[in-house]
From Swiss-Prot:
UniProt protein name: Phosphoserine aminotransferase
UniProt key word Transmembrane: no
Family indicated by similarity: Belongs to the class-V pyridoxal-phosphate-dependent aminotransferase family. SerC subfamily.
Positions where N6-(pyridoxal phosphate)lysine occurs in the chain: K199
Cofactor entry: pyridoxal 5'-phosphate
Primary location class: cytoplasm
């Protein structure tokens, strides 16, 4: 069977080596004669797995000791609610920076839970010569007392990424669902980081939360034990039964990434992949991208065909060539190629070759 390259935005492809290992030990994990899906989450074997997973993640991201690492339920949308309920209390205020669809969704959930009087927002995307560009605000000039400022450094739907570190007088809460471990960041700049697993970590159903110790002292509104960060810390992410198979696969992905040389090594590969695809788009008037170069996402490359009537043919022929899940999000249309850590350079090269051939045939 010829290679299939999956460009899905999420759930995304997992590293082939991780999938093969999971397949090999699916029915007999650690010599126990049963699957990892069948063992007790409180058994010594699984506890050892969780400890190693946290240690590997701390090493990969250089997480300081005054931060807790949590493995939680609920995905990114679950964290939209959890952040508000854990940090705002009855009187606290927060600022949301809006750069695309996912930061807008986080804002909407915050407004639903806390109301407009507690939630402020700023749109940070402007049009520069017809292209979307991020303009970060000078937060130090804002006269307000916020519990936190929330932003999403990578917008998967819009193909927008913010590479500059946010400078804020208030704790920063960041949705890193689509960019976690794709490039190095300084974790110590953040009050809390959360990420749904289904892009760069593992399968859906698991969320990673990295929270600074002092954030847990803020007044809480949460009435949901399952999304209470303090309870999660107290119970080592096992207040209730966790998504054990997703946790196992995340642990394997962390080990795989370490074997490649860590985040610094994969960041170079990710940069190569994105540059290769954007070069193809820029070199051919048959394709167009709507984001300024400085804010083009490395993880989610969005593009449109000059002739939209060819969209269906493009997708059909791409799939026949082993290039799947390239259809853009329903809100924006066009195409989207997601280049998460597990996507090999060969997959992007195959896509570029197909795009050049398709353009030549239809120009």
């Amino acid at each position: 069977m010829s290679a299939i390259y999956n460009f899905c935005a999420g759930p995304a492809m997992l590293p082939a080596a991780v999938m093969k290992k999971a397949q090999q030990e699916l029915l007999d994990w650690n010599g126990l004669g049963v699957s990892v899906m069948e063992v007790s989450h409180r058994g010594k074997e699984f506890i050892a797995l969780t400890k190693q997973a946290e240690a590997d993640l701390r090493e990969l991201m250089h997480i300081p000791q005054n931060y807790h690492v949590l493995f939680m339920h609920g995905g990114g949308r679950g964290q939209f609610s959890a952040v508000v309920n854990n940090f705002l209390g009855n009187q606290g205020r927060a600022l949301y920076l809006v750069s695309g669809q996912w930061s807008s969704a986080a804002l909407a959930e915050a407004q639903k839970l806390a109301g407009d009087t507690q939630i402020d927002s700023l749109n940070i995307v402007e049009k520069h010569n017809g292209l979307n560009a991020v303009v970060l605000p000078e937060l130090h000039k804002i006269d307000a007392d916020y519990r936190y400022v929330h932003y999403c450094p990578n917008e998967t739907v819009d193909g927008i990424e913010i590479f500059d570190e946010l400078d804020s007088p208030w704790p920063i809460v960041a949705d890193l669902s689509s960019t976690i471990m794709s490039r190095e960041i300084d974790v110590s700049r953040y009050g809390l980081i959360y990420a749904g697993a289904q892009k760069n970590i593992g399968p859906s159903g698991l969320s990673i939360v990295i929270v600074r110790d002092d954030m847990l002292k803020l007044p809480s509104l949460t009435q949901s034990s399952i999304m209470d960060y303090r309870l999660a810390v107290e119970h080592d992410s096992m207040f209730n039964t966790p998504p054990t198979f997703a946790w196992y696969l995340a642990a394997e992905v962390f080990a795989w990434l370490k074997s490649l040389g860590g985040v610094a090594s994969i960041a170079k590969i990710n940069q190569q992949k994105a540059q290769m695809l954007y070069a193809c788009i820029d070199a051919n008037p048959f394709y167009k991208n709507g984001v300024v170069a400085a804010n083009r996402s490395q993880m989610n490359v969005t593009f449109q065909l000059a002739d939209e009537s060819l969209d269906g043919a493009f997708l059909k022929e791409a799939e026949a060539a082993g290039l799947v899940a390239l259809k853009g999000h329903r809100i924006v249309g066009g195409m989207r190629a997601s280049l998460y850590n597990a996507m090999p350079l060969e997959g992007v090269a195959a896509l570029v070759s197909f795009m050049n051939e398709f353009a030549a045939k239809h120009s």
